[in-house]
């Protein structure tokens, strides 16, 4: 009996990611330096770890409510109010999730139906499309490569009008993976002026909100589009807590009343001990990202200088911890082939730009969430490779 033909047909649209394919292609290279990971190289702050230990010792190992601990929702409410001037009631406008990924899954499965369209500025994080596809909806990419990876009001409105009534949502990720771009208040207000004219959800993936390098705090669209915005955030990037799997949904009460249904039946509730640690992270550790940011800026600037001198075109990223660089003219523009050859010859791994959609081809993404020692050696090997190619 072969039951594989009875799986959800939408799974046929989902393939193993190019990131995983590339990782497999270089997996047998000994001692490869990986500037590939989308997670901080820092460790979770000690005081946060101690809070989790206390919770374990106090037998705080039972289910919490579906929305999460009230103390954590209050801490999250206070945190986003102080940092980003967002106003969400901890009683009924905040859901604690198993990372930002579950927050996205719960949100997109709740708002989308078969045949719906979702706009996404591209190049983009590849994790959105599989979720959208699973419910029978479709991602429509907006090419931003000719505008410094920034979505303009004109580009947005044109795309909205082209999709018509089938458009259900717009996803905005900023600071962005893979490009590192972010938006000023003025840019966001211009986008908000367009979005509020249309009955669409605005899903804001703001998981890198604590990692901005302009000297200004992150600005959330939730301050401008409260009746449309669903804000996704988490602690993975801000507090080096990727493995703790702790995220949040911030949305109006009439939204969370629906979103909690998909959240509940996906996971029941987030990890209890991790929630206690998160309370500590958002209170005593509310500024824990600051020392990390200083390190990231030094690493970013070093890489930009080295790669620019080698002919790569780079839009300076103002957030996250990625460089998205255009492969110089005269070299193989097939990003997978270019980086596979580089990895096999010099034992350094970046991520092919093609992993981030059709508009990422011809680019490479590297993460500066790695030590300066590794980064210096990687840049030295890249210089050798470019000279020898």
Question: Which residues does each predicted region cover?
Answer:
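Conserved N-terminal alpha-helix of the aminotransferase class I/II PLP-enzyme fold
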Residues: 64-98
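PLP-dependent class I/II
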Residues: 1-7, 12-15, 20, 25-33, ...
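A short acidic, glycine-rich active-site loop
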Residues: 59-63
């Amino acid at each position: 009996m072969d039951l594989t033909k009875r799986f959800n047909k939408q799974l046929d649209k989902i393939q193993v990611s190019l990131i995983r394919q590339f990782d497999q292609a270089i997996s047998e290279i000994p001692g490869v330096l990986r500037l590939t990971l989308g997670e901080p190289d820092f460790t979770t702050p000690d005081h946060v770890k101690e809070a989790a230990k206390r919770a374990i010792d106090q037998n705080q190992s039972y289910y919490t409510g579906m929305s999460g601990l009230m103390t954590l929702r209050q801490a999250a409410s206070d945190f986003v109010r102080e940092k980003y001037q967002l106003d969400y009631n901890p009683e009924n406008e905040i859901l604690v999730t198993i990372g930002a990924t579950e927050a996205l899954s719960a949100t997109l499965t709740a708002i989308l139906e078969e045949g719906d369209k979702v706009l996404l500025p591209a190049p983009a994080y590849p994790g959105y499309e599989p979720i959208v596809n699973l419910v029978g909806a479709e991602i429509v990419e907006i090419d931003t490569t000719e505008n410094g990876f920034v979505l303009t009001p004109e580009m947005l409105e044109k795309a909205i009008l082209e999709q018509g009534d089938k458009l259900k949502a717009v996803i905005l990720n900023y600071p962005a993976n893979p490009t590192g771009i972010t938006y000023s208040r003025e840019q966001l207000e211009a986008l908000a002026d367009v979005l509020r004219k249309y009955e669409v959800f605005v899903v804001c993936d703001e998981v890198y909100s604590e990692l901005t390098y302009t000297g200004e705090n992150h600005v959330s669209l939730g301050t401008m589009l409260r009746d449309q915005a669903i804000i996704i955030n988490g602690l993975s990037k801000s507090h080096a807590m990727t493995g703790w799997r702790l995220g949040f949904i911030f949305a109006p009460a009439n939204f969370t009343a629906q979103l909690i249904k998909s959240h509940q039946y996906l996971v029941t509730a987030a990890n209890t001990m991790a929630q206690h640690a998160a309370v500590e992270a958002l209170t005593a550790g509310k500024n824990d990202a600051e020392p990390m940011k200083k390190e990231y800026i030094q690493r970013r600037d070093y890489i930009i200088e080295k790669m620019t001198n080698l002919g790569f075109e780079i839009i300076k990223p103002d957030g996250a911890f990625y460089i998205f660089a255009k492969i110089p003219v005269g070299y193989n523009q097939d990003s997978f082939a270019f980086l596979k050859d580089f990895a096999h010859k010099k034992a350094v791994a970046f991520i092919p730009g093609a992993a981030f959609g059709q508009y990422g081809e011809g680019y490479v993404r590297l993460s500066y969430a790695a030590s300066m020692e590794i980064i210096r050696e990687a840049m030295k090997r890249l210089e050798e490779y470019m000279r020898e190619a």
